[in-house]
Amino acid sequence: MPYLDAAGDMRDIFAEYIHAKTLWIDTEVADYQSRQPRLSLIQVLDDPTDMSGDRVYILDVLQYPNIVAEFIQQIMCNSQIEKVFHNANFDLKFLGGKKAQNVTCTLELAKSIPYYLLPLPNYQLKTLATALCRFNYIDKQEQGSDWGRRPLTETQIEYAYLDCIYLAQVHLQLLELQVASNPDPKKEDLTALDARYQDLLTDWQLLKSEFEHLEERLKKAMQAQNVKETSVCKLTSYERQTVKVPFSELVNLVQNDNLSLDFPVTLTQKLQKDLGASWQKLPVEIEKNTYLRLSQKKNDAIQE
């Protein structure tokens, strides 16, 4: 885990990184709860097979805003290099924002995996690393430590480099899950899909029915007992207001006040019926959309 705090050394490693295909990156921020947070460290791993930390470079950029700018220009804005983060939106606040190109976020990647393949209570890096990679006893206590202090403690440095290792391993596992959850439709085994669909259908109908019934019972019970929260649920209420006006009155208002009001109106089946054949005199624009609906075939066999 090389720790670099000299501008020249950091520029040397940038020269290596511009040839990388993928970089796994994390950051540590000083004064992150203040109005002026400062980027303290940039941790970079260029070899996902490294579990020792030898290829995790810790760049101490606290006093080098110019080095951060160079990193953004040479690495973050380089579309040829994939940059992998967890919760990339946070890191990009300090590393180029919208200028950054070819960024992968493992948080968003995890969210895209169907829940049944990744049934986790949350998608924090610690949770993912434990569930997918069997990294146990991950200590995130140092995350909220003082990253503006110098020198950093050994515990802080260990925490910083380990996060890159967790990130890379989680990324690789998520890529495998992504492939598993998106098979080629042309090669799918329809017989196997049919069988699994049938297996789940009855259980799903029962579960859905019970769940919806429980929701209604909970709402009624909480209202009747004047309870706003239970250990699991929270009851909230809201009002929805709809403003309606007769169409003729709207037309009169537009004409009388000489308003410039022009927008398309969807001619529903009811409106078409009310207008009769007259609607065909209008300069309509017809949009056609195709939707697919999956339904269970009815059993035509006579049951006695």
Regions found by a protein language model. Give the residues of each.
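Mixed-charge, glycine-rich, non-catalytic linkers/tails in nucleic-acid processing enzymes
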Residues: E154-E215
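A broadly conserved detector of short glycine/acidic/proline-rich loop/turn motifs that flank catalytic sites
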Residues: V29, Q63, H171, E239-Q241, ...
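Exposed alpha-helical structural elements
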Residues: D9-I13, I67-F71, Q124-L128, T155, ...
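Residue-level signal for secondary-structure boundary elements
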Residues: T22-I25, L118-P121, Y137-Q141, L172, ...
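Residues that form generic nucleotide/phosphate-binding pockets
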Residues: I13-E16, Q74-I75, L128-L132, R196, ...
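Extended, charge-rich alpha-helical segments
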Residues: Q205-E304
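Conserved DEDDh/DEDDy metal-dependent 3′-5′ exonuclease domain
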Residues: P2-D5, I18-L23, Y32-Y166
